Amino acid sequence: MFSSESVTEGHPDKICDQISDAIVDALLTADPLSRVAAEVVVNTGLVLLTGEITSQAQVNFTRLVRDKVAEIGYTDAKNGFCAESCAVLVAFDEQSPDIAQGVNMALESRGSQEDQFDLVGAGDQGLMFGFACDETPELMPLPISLAHRLSRQLATVRKNGTLPYLRPDGKTQVTVAYEEGRPVGIHTLLISTQHTPTIGAITEEAAVQERIRADLWEAVVTPVFAELPIKPDSHTRFLTNPTGKFVIGGPQGDAGLTGRKIIVDTYGGYSRHGGGAFSGKDPTKVDRSAAYAARYVAKNIVAAGLAQKCEVQVSYAIGVARPINILVETFGTGRIPDEELLRLVQRHFDLRPAAILAQFQLRELPRQRGGRFYQNVAVYGHFGQTHLDLPWERTDKAALLREEALAKATALLA
């Protein structure tokens, strides 16, 4: 069995991620060359913005924060946190010139400028992972895919008034049963959701929780699994608010910080993680852009039918454009050796930071999408959200990889 969790947009850490990425969107929309490292802290009645920004853009950060908090759903002081009454403190510095010099002029370009993609160095050292598997149509692990679906539906029924007693904070967790490496059933579903103290005339705590349990099954679980081949059955455990009432939540219940939900943001623990968060960072930061590129590589390999599972590691040195290493691992599911897959990757994927920026248009996308891009992936996962038309989710190189692998295999058999 394997478990993964997700959180709703009203979770304290996710509030921070969304504000951080709303800042990235606003700055890149006005100035695509902005350098951003925006960190956010939330607590009862407080939002603190800090980090480093170098940009020509002029942004009203206080208004941005209030608008995002209101969009999430914190518009009533009864929720313990309110968009219009919370204090907003802004404490940004400029990016260090020592860091900027390595990004502006990579090691490879000093003395030579033959290739424009050698001009931009990695913004930091680090290692990033990308992953894909054939458990879902979007080529994501099933546990995290289901957890995100439940969290998204939980927010939907709150916002559209289906369950008006729900409040913004919430978490989900799904445990999937596997046999011989393939998902076969749902072992446990867990939903914890913030709610009002009473539901209409229902005031007794046990009765409130009983109503919540019934409503969540009908309005959240049932729609999520309606068209999926694997469904909960009579053996599935269904847990809701296991500690009892969940009235105090959001920043009133727990402080939140940007970058504390990196497993929720990626593959739910199913794949390794390099440790770097995504939100609040402009795409010159390889923590973000290279993780997107590694997902793109892994997804195209799986989409090509060359493996059932694929994990790609890439690492960088600060100020150096070319990756230090690339690793391809298919966990014994590859149709061709991992070493040959690595050669395909090296031939067909340019993982230098500037090449990633150019191919995915990571600096231009916020402006192209009307000022909203990164904040949309700051909740419910940076991967697998195919409805958002994310460039790293495309499988436009799958056919090429498949054809070249087939040609290689045919040549070996000739």
UniProtKB/Swiss-Prot annotation:
Pathway: Amino-acid biosynthesis; S-adenosyl-L-methionine biosynthesis; S-adenosyl-L-methionine from L-methionine: step 1/1. InterPro entries: ADOMET_SYNTHASE_CS, S-AdoMet_synt_C, S-AdoMet_synt_central, S-AdoMet_synt_N, S-AdoMet_synthetase, S-AdoMet_synthetase_sfam. L-methionine binds at residues 52, 95, 254, 285. Homotetramer; dimer of dimers. This is S-adenosylmethionine synthase. Its cofactor is Mg(2+); K(+). It is found in: Cytoplasm. GO terms for cellular component: cytoplasm. Keywords: ATP-binding, Cytoplasm, Magnesium, Metal-binding, Nucleotide-binding, One-carbon metabolism, Potassium, Transferase. One of its GO terms (biological process) is S-adenosylmethionine biosynthetic process. It comes from Synechococcus sp. (strain JA-2-3B'a(2-13)) (Cyanobacteria bacterium Yellowstone B-Prime). It is an enzyme of class 2 (transferase). Its EC number is 2.5.1.6. Binds 2 divalent ions per subunit. Binds 1 potassium ion per subunit. It holds the Pfam family S-AdoMet_synt_N.
